[in-house]
């Protein structure tokens, strides 16, 4: 059972996964050992899937974001497996979502520049054919947050 303290722990860890356990315990009014047990339980139960380092895209020379809307034209199991394998193999494609509406998928690409989009476009086309693709260049990131709201659990 998830309670207020568990949700608070999850929120704190999302904000800073390197926060010392002693500080988390203090903020949620628990002993360090009780807090440690809760964090371990949250991991075991799958609420915490892992811990990652968030990189500065400009410092690693990937400042450009392009969203690619894709209409596949085919919806057979074999084609979808090929599509999923193709997009999963390209590290510059950082997110893929299946959609409702006029397009089947939206892909988020992290690129060094706009010109590099053509390289990725050709890589994708080597593996799968599309009915339609439309690329959109992000002019500004207004909000980006990997943290999820915890008030729904």
Curated annotation (Swiss-Prot):
The keyword Transcription regulation applies. One of its GO terms (biological process) is response to amino acid. Residues 21-40 bind DNA. One of its GO terms (cellular component) is cytosol. It holds the Pfam family HTH_24. Keywords: DNA-binding, Transcription, Transcription regulation. GO terms for molecular function: sequence-specific DNA binding. Residues 2-63 form the HTH asnC-type domain. InterPro entries: ArsR-like_HTH, AsnC-type_HTH_dom, Dimeric_a/b-barrel, Tscrpt_reg_AsnC-like, Tscrpt_reg_AsnC/Lrp_C, Tscrpt_reg_HTH_AsnC-type_CS, WH-like_DNA-bd_sf, WH_DNA-bd_sf. This is HTH-type transcriptional regulator Zrp. It comes from Zymomonas mobilis subsp. mobilis (strain ATCC 31821 / ZM4 / CP4).
């Amino acid at each position: 059972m998830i309670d207020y303290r568990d949700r608070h722990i999850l929120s704190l860890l999302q904000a800073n996964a390197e926060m010392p356990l002693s500080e988390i315990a203090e903020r949620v009014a628990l002993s360090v050992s009780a807090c440690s047990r809760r964090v371990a339980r949250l991991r075991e139960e799958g609420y915490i899937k892992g811990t990652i380092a968030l990189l500065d895209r400009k410092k690693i020379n990937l400042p450009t974001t392009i969203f690619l809307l894709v209409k596949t034209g085919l919806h057979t199991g074999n084609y979808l497996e090929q599509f999923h394998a193709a997009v999963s193999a390209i590290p510059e494609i950082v997110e893929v979502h299946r959609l409702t509406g006029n397009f089947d998928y939206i892909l988020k690409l992290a690129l060094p520049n706009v010109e590099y989009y053509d390289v990725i476009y050709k890589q994708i086309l080597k593996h799968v054919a599309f009915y339609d693709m439309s690329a959109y260049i992000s002019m500004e990131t207004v909000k980006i947050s990997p943290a999820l709201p915890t008030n729904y659990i």
